[in-house]
């Protein structure tokens, strides 16, 4: 594939159903505490409330923390710290393993994907880097598209 000549496969799962994957180092790292404290960010791109369920990697049992209210995911979690003009979505956004145990599910992957795609389109229109899109404009556009972003 052109442009991918230097890509190296570091690791892959031995079976389907892997819950924990790699996460980028983003402009902000979402933490378990952010989720349990129901933190709301000014640059929020989605609202979410899935429980934190950490499955034992050795098999049998899980740690479960109910999320009693919603939290938000900031746009900065989609923006890599050192790579310009790239956005990520889904399980690989910037966060701790504990936080990922909540945001790794499909509805959140869809919401972060919508935010990343919308931000990329806005960046083209604004003539700026993807990570420099005005977050208020991004939030307004996502809301017009039907995204739920609570303050």
Walk through the language-model features, giving the residues of each.
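Flavin (FAD/FMN)-binding glycine-rich loop and adjacent Rossmann-like elements that form
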Residues: 1-151
């Amino acid at each position: 594939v052109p442009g991918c000549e230097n890509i190296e496969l570091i690791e892959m799962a031995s079976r389907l159903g892997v819950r924990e994957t790699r996460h980028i180092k983003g402009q902000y790292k979402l933490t378990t505490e952010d989720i349990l404290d129901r933190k709301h960010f000014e640059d929020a791109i989605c609202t979410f409330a899935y429980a934190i369920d950490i499955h034992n990697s050795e098999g049998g049992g899980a740690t479960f923390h109910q999320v009693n209210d919603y939290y938000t995911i900031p746009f900065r979690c989609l923006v890599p710290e050192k790579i310009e003009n790239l956005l990520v979505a889904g399980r690989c956004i910037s966060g701790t393993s504990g936080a990922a145990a909540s945001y790794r599910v499909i509805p959140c992957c869809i919401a972060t994907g919508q935010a990343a795609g919308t931000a990329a389109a806005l960046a083209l229109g604004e003539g700026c880097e993807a990570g420099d899109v005005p977050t208020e404009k991004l939030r307004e556009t996502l809301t017009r598209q039907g995204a739920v972003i609570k303050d």
